[in-house]
Amino acid sequence: MRAVVQRVSEAFVEVEGEVVGRIGLGLLVLLGVGQKDSLEDALYLARKIVNLRVFPDAQDKMNLSLKDVGGEVLLVSQFTLYADTRKGNRPSFAKAAPPDQGKRLYEAALEAFLQQGVHVETGVYGAHMRVHLVNDGPVTLFLDSEERFRPR
């Protein structure tokens, strides 16, 4: 499972011109589900994201987590994080999970955020969306649940 995580001062997502999710201070999480992903991947990423110390403390050092600052999450599905661009110019998405598996694990990640006491807003799974954000910092991180198995 892959996530692009952006620290934001505000963000919202629109579907067909209607705002369906909006947050203030927090993290915009673009979440992609791969064919090999499982519930453990969803739980791992949700825990990791909630506990990332990417918010500034009183000395302006990145030392506070989402929970520490009372931040929110805007969770948006993003299967294109599994794009393979090695051959030709048209991306292949063969490594992305099929829609039913992707939706199930996206919803598992959503539930994992909620279980940690985080307020979560969402886009609409599978819809064409417009995501608006004010990236604070800017701070943008790429996380891949497979990385947890690689040696440091």
UniProtKB/Swiss-Prot annotation:
GO terms for biological process: D-amino acid catabolic process. Its main location: cytoplasm. Its EC number is 3.1.1.96. The keyword Membrane does not apply. Pfam families: Tyr_Deacylase (PF02580). GO terms for cellular component: cytoplasm. It catalyses: glycyl-tRNA(Ala) + H2O = tRNA(Ala) + glycine + H(+); a D-aminoacyl-tRNA + H2O = a tRNA + a D-alpha-amino acid + H(+). It is an enzyme of class 3 (hydrolase). Keywords: Cytoplasm, Hydrolase, RNA-binding, tRNA-binding. Belongs to the DTD family. A Gly-cisPro motif from one monomer fits into the active site of the other monomer to allow specific chiral rejection of L-amino acids. NCBIfam families: D-aminoacyl-tRNA deacylase. Homodimer. This is D-aminoacyl-tRNA deacylase. It comes from Thermus thermophilus (strain ATCC 27634 / DSM 579 / HB8). The lineage of its organism: Bacteria, Thermotogati, Deinococcota, Deinococci, Thermales.
